Amino acid sequence: MSSLPRFSQINPATIVAELDTILAQNRAELLLLLSEIISLDWNFIQKLDDLDDRLQHFWSPINHLHAVKQTAKLRLAYNECLAKISAYSSELSQNSRLYQAIKTLDNGDYRFNYAQKKCLHNELRDFHLGGIDLPKAKQKRYQVIQAQLAQ
């Protein structure tokens, strides 16, 4: 993996398909991660971060390119991807199994350092801001609103 983005290799024609692949991989790995929980520890959070890093490594250069050197094709791909990323984000923030796993870590007898505790508290805060406490019907409405805001 290169340390700098290769902007010249970003192809608007393939961005949506590449994002779909990454989101599918992340969803599959999250399901596997949640199904394999035997004992929770900090490795669980690190694996979640790896999923986020994969998405950010892909999306950040595209987001930057969209801001500084926009073309019609890039704009179309970017807008289509925004809706998908928004849906994925809402899906994660309303995933009750993921929320419970992180809550269990936070409430457990683990000895985390300050940064780790802060990370857990921020994760739980983000779940609440993402609508985890809402009834299912209101969660769906929240997802619709988030999708509209992403447009």
Regions found by a protein language model. Give the residues of each.
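Zn2+-dependent metallopeptidase catalytic domains
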Residues: 1-151
